[in-house]
C-alpha cells in the first residue's frame, strides 16, 4: 500500500486495490481506472529501474487507450520510445511523427542506433531544455544509453567487416577513430563483447 500511496492514486481506486487486490481489480474496474492504475504502476517500475516490467505495464496501458486519445498515447509513447532505443530498437518514422517525437527523440535515437557517442551527447545537450520538462526521460537516457551506444558500435563494425565471425579489437578501435569517439579500452571491449553474444547474428 505504501507504493500506491506514494503514487497519489485517487481514493476509490486505492480502496478497491486494498479490498480486492490488483489482479482482481483490473478485470472488473472501469477502463479509465485500469488505465490510470497501469500507467502509475509503469511509472513506479520505471523509476525503480525495472525497465522490462515498466515496458510491459506501459504496453498494457497503451493497449487499453482509445485510438483517438492522442495526448495520453503520446505520454506513454515517450517512455516506450526511450526504453526501446536504449535496447537497440527504434519506432518507425511515421510513429514518431504521429506523436511528435521526431523533433525530440529521433536524432537521439539515430545517434544511439549508429553507435555515435559524440552525436548522442551533442543531441542530448541540444535538447536538454525540452527533455528537462520530462526530467526522468533526460536522466534515463543519460544513464542508460551508453551500453546501447557501445553495443551498436560493435554491431556496426561487424557489418562493415562483412559480417565475419571474428571482430578484432583493432577493427573496433579503427571505427572509433573514424567516428572521433573516445578510445575503447580492452576491459570495455571485453564487457561489450560479453553483452553482444547472441545479439548480433540475426
Task: Kindly label every feature range from the protein language model.
Residues 1-3:
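Amphipathic alpha-helical repeat scaffolds of TPR domains
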Residues 8-11, 52:
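Residue register within tetratricopeptide repeats
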Residues 10, 14-16, 41, 89:
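Acidic, Ser/Thr/Pro-rich intrinsically disordered cytosolic tails and loops
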Amino acid at each position: 500500500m505504501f507504493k500506491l500511496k506514494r503514487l497519489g492514486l485517487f481514493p476509490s481506486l486505492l480502496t478497491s486495490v486494498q479490498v480486492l487486490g490488483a489482479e482482481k481489480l483490473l478485470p472488473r474496474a472501469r477502463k479509465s481506472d485500469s488505465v490510470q492504475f497501469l500507467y502509475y504502476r509503469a511509472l513506479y517500475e520505471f523509476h525503480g529501474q525495472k525497465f522490462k516490467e515498466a515496458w510491459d505495464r506501459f504496453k498494457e496501458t497503451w493497449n487499453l487507450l482509445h485510438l483517438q486519445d492522442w495526448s495520453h498515447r503520446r505520454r506513454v509513447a515517450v517512455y516506450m520510445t526511450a526504453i526501446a532505443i536504449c535496447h537497440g530498437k527504434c519506432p518507425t518514422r511515421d510513429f514518431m511523427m504521429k506523436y511528435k517525437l521526431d523533433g525530440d527523440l529521433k536524432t537521439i535515437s539515430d545517434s544511439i542506433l549508429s553507435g555515435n557517442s559524440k552525436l548522442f551527447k551533442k543531441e542530448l545537450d541540444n535538447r536538454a531544455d525540452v527533455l528537462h520538462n520530462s526530467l526522468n526521460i533526460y536522466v534515463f537516457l543519460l544513464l542508460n544509453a551508453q551500453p546501447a551506444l557501445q553495443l551498436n558500435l560493435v554491431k556496426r563494425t561487424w557489418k562493415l567487416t562483412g559480417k565475419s565471425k571474428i571482430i578484432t579489437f583493432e577493427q573496433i578501435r579503427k571505427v572509433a577513430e573514424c567516428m572521433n569517439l573516445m578510445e575503447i579500452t580492452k576491459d570495455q571491449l571485453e564487457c561489450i563483447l560479453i553483452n553482444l553474444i547472441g545479439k548480433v547474428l540475426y
